[in-house]
Amino acid sequence: WNRNPEYYTESDWRGTLDKEGGSALENQAIHTFDLMQWLTVPIKTVEASCSTKRHKGVIETEDTCDVFMTGPNGERLVFFCTNCYVKNAPVELEIVCENGSIRMVGNLVTTELDGKTETKDFSSGTVFGKDYWGSGHGFLIEDYYTRLAAGERFPVSGEEAIVSTRLLHAVYSSAKNHEVIRL
């Protein structure tokens, strides 16, 4: 995405270590990062680099982060996020497997399996906030209230949710200490 310096200076918490903790990854790309780990294999190693490229002297946190991860059988996962892009483009996530792939760009999901390609639009029609955030927030909010009213369990438990938090901590630790983190 594109975050200009004013985005950070107009708030007392954005871009600060003690109040925000992180910027490009922890604040902007966290839902995509969470989705990536949820859709793929358990992460076993993390090697990351986080830096401030465009917003030097403006923020204490990162505006760019790249992460190389491996799974239990040597699967490779690469994640990149930045707030230095020239526009607020839709989120992109691609998972390439032995026999097929899934590619998400915004609300469009394209699957390829056995030489057949199918694209589905998962737009909910309800967008909370900016359109490049996607419509996932609308789905989640609606599902939350529906399940709450019905007394149903939520699809993700606290134990499952902590996986992304631990992974996020490993990314920042790897970037800070310039080392591979084993999970």
Model regions and ranges:
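Predominantly a Rossmann-like dinucleotide-binding segment in NAD(P)-dependent oxidoreductases
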Residues: 1-58, 178
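Active-site rim elements
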Residues: 21-23, 128-132, 150-154
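A generic structural signal for residues located within well-ordered alpha-helices
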Residues: 28-31, 136, 159, 163
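A general structural signal for well-ordered alpha-helical segments in protein cores
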Residues: 32-33, 137-142, 168-169
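Phosphate/oxyanion-binding loops and surfaces in catalytic or ligand/nucleic-acid-binding neighborhoods
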Residues: 42-43, 98-102, 171-174
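NAD(P)-dinucleotide binding in Rossmann-like oxidoreductases
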Residues: 53-62, 72-139, 157
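C-terminal helix-rich "cap/oligomerization" subdomain common to oxidoreductases
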Residues: 72, 143-183
